[in-house]
A protein has these predicted regions:
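Conserved Asp/Asn-Gly motif in the active-site loop of CheY-like receiver
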Residues: 63-67, 122, 140
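Two-component/phosphorelay signaling modules centered on CheY-like receiver
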Residues: 43-61
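Short hydrophobic/Thr-rich beta-strand motif most characteristic of the beta2 strand and flanking loop
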Residues: 57-64, 72, 134
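Non-catalytic signal-transmission and effector/linker regions of two-component phosphorelay proteins
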Residues: 1-35, 141-152
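The feature encodes the CheY-like receiver
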Residues: 88, 106, 118
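Active-site beta3 strand of CheY-like receiver
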Residues: 76-82, 87
Length: 152
């Protein structure tokens, strides 16, 4: 039986995206691209996102549970965070609340990428500070467009 991967790789790159809102980037000079922290316990999804981000000149780093999410974010100082809600231990809502307690993380845009659907989850994510909300699976075009709009 074939398993549907959360990211779809058979689409063209999103080269014709809307212009990105540019902001000062604390990682660009050091690493050559925006640093993006992916917080998800799905290893296959992380592998797919890693491949896609690197192909688009982003520098991914990863945390696989809520416990390591905050320490990784503080150590890596990402320009953007991609966050799953259904994490082992505490959920993604807890993670977003934790980020809001740190001035250095409060303005980092968060994209929620989750298997949870429905308006209630989308609203909760928005209220917690998420800038975008996508249900899994999401196409590369939609994800990369959102990333470009938020960090360039």
């Amino acid at each position: 039986m074939l398993q549907m991967l959360p990211l779809i790789f058979d689409e063209p790159d999103a080269d014709l995206c809307l212009p990105a809102r540019l902001k000062p980037n604390r990682n660009l000079a050091r690493t050559g691209g925006n640093k993006i922290l992916v917080i998800d316990d799905d290893q296959i999804l992380c592998l797919g996102i890693d491949t896609r981000l690197k192909a688009n000149d982003y520098n991914p780093c990863f945390a696989h549970d809520a416990e390591s999410a905050l320490s990784t974010a503080l150590a890596e100082m990402p320009d953007l965070i991609i966050l799953d809600i259904g994490l082992p231990g505490h959920d993604g809502y807890f993670v977003m609340q934790s980020f809001n307690a740190y001035p250095e993380l409060v303005d980092v845009p968060v994209i929620v990428l989750t298997g949870l659907d429905g308006f209630t989850h989308q609203r909760r994510c928005s209220d917690a500070g998420a800038r975008r909300f996508f249900e899994k699976p999401v196409t590369n075009l939609r994800l990369m467009t959102a990333i470009r709009q938020l960090v360039g």
